């Protein structure tokens, strides 16, 4: 199918369909969605969740306490927002059941650039997936999306409708709009003259989906929400005639759907008054002497915390506060999820194919999240950040607390302050374009750009110092460690084999040392007494600064003996035990004399050296670095290593 046929097919599928009232009622018998409220239809569009048993994944089990959590495919690109999405779905479920939430404003509260607008756009987009049914008369559709049920009286007609068509009583009770009341009068009470149109909600055409934004005190009045008289029609109709009214307000257009109020609490208070009755009673008054207008939809509002705090602290606004269902949308606090956000943003730009050195997105993610976290008590903020990503630090940081302990101490407002994703993405844009020749990103340029930007933003001194401390105290040393490993592993061709040899030798020496036995090397025949074994073990332990060798050796040997039982008597992989892996890596790379000629970009004295250097660069490029980045990062690493 070519693009033109595909487009036509889509256009035809979205066309309105007209029914008689009798046909509509017959449809109601088979299809609940014909009379479902806005929250029910939105739930249908969201679809069923994928249930994830976090007990099966160690990382998730630490974050979600082994709970079974729901993940919704409709929100799969909203990373790290499980709690907010679950609260939105909970609101919709309760509203769909006709509970108190049906009468409340769904209010997304969060910091700038935290994803509130994106969530609102997704909800509006989902609302387009399920059609609505609207009254029509003489070929004209109701301007306020009157549902056909507005024609029926709950007291008089509910029993018959329930008996004949299976329509529950609670779906009746929506008032008739002045437009529908006038047509009913013209038809002499004959409701069969009405038609019912199946319409697809549309953001573009503002059908059942509307958006309103705050203006200033002088130029915004309630007509933005409720509409006003259309002056052009006064030539033909009286001022209080329903046909003289322009139903252009957001509440008029959003009936049976969703109305988004952007930065709601920036609007003048007088503009918000119609929302009180629209939510609580399902109707509101227009600006002229016409009867009340119906509203049976969702009001979705969002704003930043500062506006909410100002509004909440004003005693005159108590009536509003009781009608608001708050969903907090904080910044993402998990490194792995923040990285996915950056990747998503990059994929929607020209930079999607630009080289990005390993560790760049991780480093920026760490910086952003450190800025959002509250300082913990008696623990490092860097450890807290790692715990928030689901890591277990019991072997590496004895002071680290559990995820829940950190959360409890931080309180409910954690993640509502700090650097936004927008700020981070602007930084990333500058990093990719830092080099005038090569469009690529690497952490060294990232450090430079971040330091510059912290100065330019003119943060309060204490905050700026805190951000610089994150850079110089945590991120730069950690990255130096990371790039050191990258360089060293690329340098050692038989890295894995060499590491395994040291591991096996260490375990053998430690085992004989613990048993206080001599050991004879089967390859060389050399005999090691307990003192010699201790000396050999210390050669491996000292570069890593092991403070209690006796306990460490016992711990390693016990681990290996247990592992052998499940591994056909063979030693486990040398990387399987984090503590010893770190010790071996430090031992392997403690001697840099051989390393320097290979990784430096100076002129080489022999073809052998040149070949080793070229092989090293090739292996680094296989890891995801460009040739230019290999040079930059090696030179930076050597400078940092020398200065430390």
UniProtKB/Swiss-Prot annotation:
Q: What Pfam families has UniProt attached to this entry?
A: AAA_PrkA, PrkA
**Catalytic activity reported:** L-seryl-[protein] + ATP = O-phospho-L-seryl-[protein] + ADP + H(+); L-threonyl-[protein] + ATP = O-phospho-L-threonyl-[protein] + ADP + H(+)
What subcellular compartments does it reside in?
A: Cytoplasm
Q: In which domain of life is the source organism classified?
A: Bacteria
Listed Gene3D superfamilies: P-loop containing nucleotide triphosphate hydrolases
GO annotation terms (biological process): cellular response to nitrogen starvation
The UniProt GO MF terms for this protein read: protein kinase activity
Q: What induces it?
A: Expression is probably regulated by NtrC, which binds to the promoter region of the yeaGH operon during nitrogen starvation. Expressed in nitrogen-starved cells shortly after sensing nitrogen starvation. It appears to be continuously expressed for up to 24 hours into nitrogen starvation.
Q: Which enzyme class, named as a word?
A: transferase
Give the E.C. number(s). Answer: 2.7.11.1
What PANTHER family does its record include? PROTEIN KINASE PRKA, PROTEIN PRKA
Spell out the NCBIfam families in the cross-references.
Answer: PRK15455.1 (NF011999)
Family assignment from sequence similarity: Belongs to the PrkA family.
**Summary of the function given for this chain in its UniProt record:** Kinase that plays a role in the adaptation to sustained nitrogen starvation. May act by indirectly repressing the transcription of the two toxin/antitoxin modules mqsR/mqsA and dinJ/yafQ, which positively impacts the expression of rpoS, the master regulator of the general bacterial stress response. In vitro, can phosphorylate the isocitrate lyase AceA only in the presence of malate, suggesting that it may play a role during glucose to malate shift. Displays autokinase and casein kinase activities in vitro. It can also phosphorylate specifically a 65 kDa unidentified cytoplasmic protein.
Q: What is this protein called?
A: Serine/threonine kinase YeaG
Q: Which gene encodes it?
A: yeaG
């Amino acid at each position: 199918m070519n693009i033109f046929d595909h487009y036509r097919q889509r256009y035809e599928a979205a066309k309105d369909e007209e029914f008689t009232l009798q046909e509509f009622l017959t449809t109601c018998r088979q299809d609940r969605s014909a009379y479902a409220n806005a929250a029910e239809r939105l739930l249908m569009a969201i679809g069923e969740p994928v249930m994830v048993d976090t007990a099966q994944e160690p990382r998730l089990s630490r974050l979600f306490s082994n709970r079974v959590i729901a993940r919704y495919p409709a929100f799969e690109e909203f990373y790290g927002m499980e709690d907010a999405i679950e609260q939105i779905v909970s609101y919709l479920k309760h509203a769909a059941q006709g509970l108190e939430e049906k009468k409340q404003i769904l209010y997304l509260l969060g910091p700038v650039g935290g994803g509130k607008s994106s969530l609102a756009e997704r909800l509006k987009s989902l609302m387009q997936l399920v059609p609505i049914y609207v009254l029509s008369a003489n070929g004209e559709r109701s301007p306020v999306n009157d549902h056909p049920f507005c024609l029926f009286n709950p007291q008089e007609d509910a029993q018959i409708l329930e008996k004949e068509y299976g329509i529950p009583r609670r779906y009746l009770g929506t008032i008739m709009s002045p437009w529908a009341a006038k047509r009913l009068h013209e038809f002499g009470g004959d409701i069969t003259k009405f038609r019912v149109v199946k319409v697809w909600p549309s953001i573009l055409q503002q059908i059942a989906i509307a958006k309103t934004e705050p203006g200033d005190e002088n130029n915004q009045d309630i007509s933005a929400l409720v509409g006003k008289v259309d002056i052009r029609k006064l030539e033909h109709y009286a001022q209080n005639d329903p046909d003289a009214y322009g139903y252009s307000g957001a509440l008029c257009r959003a009936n049976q759907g969703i109305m988004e109020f952007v930065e709601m609490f920036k609007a003048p208070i007088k503009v918000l008054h119609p929302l009180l009755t629209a939510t609580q009673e399902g109707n509101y008054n227009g600006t002229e002497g016409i009867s009340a207008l119906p509203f049976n939809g969702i009001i979705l509002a969002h704003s930043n915390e500062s506006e909410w705090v100002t509004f909440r602290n004003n005693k005159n606004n108590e009536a509003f506060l009781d009608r608001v269902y708050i969903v907090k949308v904080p910044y993402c606090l998990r490194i792995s999820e923040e990285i996915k956000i950056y990747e998503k943003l990059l994929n929607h730009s020209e930079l999607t194919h630009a080289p990005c050195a390993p560790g760049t997105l991780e480093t920026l993610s760490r910086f952003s999240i450190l800025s959002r976290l509250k300082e913990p008590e008696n623990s490092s903020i860097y450890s807290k950040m790692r715990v928030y990503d689901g890591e277990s630090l019991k072997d590496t940081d004895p002071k680290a607390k559990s995820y829940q302990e950190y959360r409890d101490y931080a309180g409910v407002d954690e993640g509502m302050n700090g650097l936004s994703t927008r700020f981070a993405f602007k930084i990333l844009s500058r990093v990719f374009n830092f080099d005038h020749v090569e469009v690529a990103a690497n952490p060294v340029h990232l450090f430079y750009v971040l330091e510059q930007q912290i100065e330019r933003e003119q943060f309060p001194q204490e905050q700026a110092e805190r951000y610089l401390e994150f850079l110089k105290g945590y991120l730069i040393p950690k990255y130096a460690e990371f790039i050191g490993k990258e360089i060293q592993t690329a340098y050692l061709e038989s890295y894995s084999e060499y590491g395994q040899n040291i591991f096996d030798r260490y375990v053998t020496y430690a085992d004989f040392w613990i048993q206080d036995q001599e050991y004879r090397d089967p390859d060389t025949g050399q005999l090691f007494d307990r003192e010699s074994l201790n000396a050999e073990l210390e050669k491996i332990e000292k570069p890593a600064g092991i403070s209690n060798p006796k306990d460490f050796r016992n711990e390693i040997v016990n681990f290996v003996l247990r592992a052998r039982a499940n591994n056909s008597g063979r030693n486990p992989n040398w990387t399987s035990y984090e503590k010893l892996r770190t010790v071996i890596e430090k031992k392997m790379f403690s001697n840099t004399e051989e390393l320097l000629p290979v990784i430096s970009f100076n002129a080489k004295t022999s073809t052998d050296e040149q070949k080793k250097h070229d092989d090293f660069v090739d292996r680094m490029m296989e890891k995801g670095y460009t040739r230019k980045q290999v040079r930059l990062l090696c030179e930076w690493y050597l400078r940092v290593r020398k200065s430390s």
